Each structure stands twice: as structure tokens, then as C-alpha cells.
A protein has these predicted regions:
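Binuclear metal-ion centers of metallo-dependent hydrolases, dominated by the metallo-beta-lactamase
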Residues: 69-143
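Active-site-proximal loop/helix segments of hydrolase catalytic cores
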Residues: 1-76
Length: 143
């Protein structure tokens, strides 16, 4: 796990930690050392990560799910995806958005995605808008 902090914002790159490691971090670290505006979601959003306690401790504004298109593991897990949504955390999936660029000049975060910045010429305006949003639930998510 790596936390990168500037004057106003921080990013937490969680790697492949699971809920047991999340709980150990919560117990061992001062709360301000876990808080981050940007979270690279632990273990691609698997069902063994992103516990509610961890999300509450980190309290991110933006969560990036690093997942491959039609990955064989089904990441992110629908319950994990919903857990982030229930906390009003902006969710981005790299399989839908491509690369994610976040600029932190000032108090606000500016989030852009590769597919919204460089749409394919054959894409319609509606497809580009859907990709730019990239907050769609996984296909197997339950409402």
C-alpha cells in the first residue's frame, strides 16, 4: 500500500490487500494517515476487500476500480460496487473509462478519463457520454 499526499489532497494505492489487512491498518495507523481523496480500490473490488470500516476510514471522494474488460474474476464484485455507491463515492472503472487523469490544482479534484478525452471517431455522442460517465454498475449487479 502507498499513500501519496500533497498540500490539499491525498491518494491511497491499496494494492491487493484484503479485509484482514484493512482491519490491521485501521488498528495500527492514525486516522489521518489513511484518509485520502482518491482511492485505487483494493484487490480490483473483489468481495474480500473494501470493507465498510476501511471505506469509512479512508473516506475517498473518488474510487478507481482497476479491472480488465470481461475479466474472468467478475471484478468488481456487485456488493463492493454498491458499497462505494452507498457512500456517495464517485466510482470509475478502467474497463469502461480507460486511463483516469485526476488534477488536483486547488481545492477541487478534476477527474477526466482517456475515453472521454479521446473518443473514437466511430463512437456516437451518446456512447461517448456513457463512457465519460463510466459509473455504470457491473452487468451482474443487483439493484
Amino acid at each position: 500500500m502507498l499513500r501519496i499526499a500533497g498540500e490539499r489532497h491525498a491518494a491511497l494505492l491499496a494494492g491487493d490487500i484484503g479485509s484482514a489487512q484493512e482491519m490491521a491498518l485501521i488498528a495500527a495507523e492514525a486516522p489521518e494517515r489513511l484518509m485520502a481523496d482518491i482511492l485505487l480500490v483494493p484487490h480490483h473490488g473483489s468481495k474480500t476487500s473494501s470493507s465498510g470500516a476501511f471505506l469509512d476510514a479512508v473516506s475517498p471522494q473518488v474510487a478507481i476500480f482497476q479491472v480488465g474488460y470481461r475479466n474472468r474474476y467478475g471484478h468488481p464484485h456487485p456488493q463492493v460496487w454498491q458499497r462505494y455507491g452507498a457512500r456517495d463515492i464517485e466510482r470509475l472503472r478502467t474497463d469502461a473509462a480507460g486511463a483516469v487523469v485526476i488534477e488536483t490544482g486547488g481545492d477541487a479534484l478534476e477527474v477526466r478519463t482517456a475515453r472521454s478525452m479521446r473518443p473514437r471517431y466511430w463512437s456516437s455522442a451518446l456512447e461517448v457520454a456513457a463512457l465519460a460517465d463510466a459509473t455504470e454498475a457491473p452487468a451482474d449487479a443487483q439493484p
